[in-house]
Amino acid sequence: QVWVSDPTWDNHRAMFEGAGFQVNTYPYYDATTGGLKFDAMLSAIDALPAQSIVLLHACCHNPTGYDITAAQWEQVIAVVKERNLTAFLDMAYQGFGYGIAEDGAVIAKFVAAGLNIFVSTSFSKSFSLYGERVGALSVVGSSKEETDRVLSQLKIAIRTNYSNPPTHGGAIVAAVLGNPELRALWEKELGEMRVRIKAMRQKLVDGLKAAGVTKDMSFITTQIGMFSYSGLSKDQMVRLRSEFGVYGTDTGRMCVAALNGKNIDHVCASIAKVMQ
């Protein structure tokens, strides 16, 4: 069985169910406090049967924007190891949280603990290759024999699924990462985007207050990554789309990265109207 956070990216459930797994959830987001139910999450993971698969967002949790702290990760790793669980780490937004190395540190912690893990990495956002869907699946095994068996099974799945992936996007990523000058430029631009997104979070909070929203929306600035869990209801999100042309999911998730100087005032005014 697979266990995913509540909530998680919708496609996580769809993909695992499509592969024949039973998908369950563990507590994560606390709608009352606007934070994490970490104690409940840890207790739930600690009660899982051995060899259960636990899907964890390595950084920039989608959709909530709330991440586990470094100290909390240590507790999660200890429980995963003690309970003999399999960690599946989804790394879709490396570099958008605190930095490339900082966001990737959790992977090294799992490996240092001697755990066998799966890591799915996406370059679609960090390289602006959204239409190319560039990524990788990395597997850490306990022996060469074990990893050989895993690789064999992966090849069978790939052969019956897509056979060969498109090479264009992967070639772009390889060219950038393999060239020191291009890599430095990419890291600089990614850092600029990270700073811009954080700045837009603050502008969103300030703009909502200026538009007459009396509710404290400062929690938006404590979230990280591309998305924000706004706390808006499904009815409010439907109104935003139908009446004001502002788009987000029915769960209240909004893409902060889509905000800019030209649309921020309209977005804030629209949200203020549906919150009245």
Q: Which residues are covered by each model-predicted region?
A:
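Active-site PLP attachment segment
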Residues: 106-149, 153
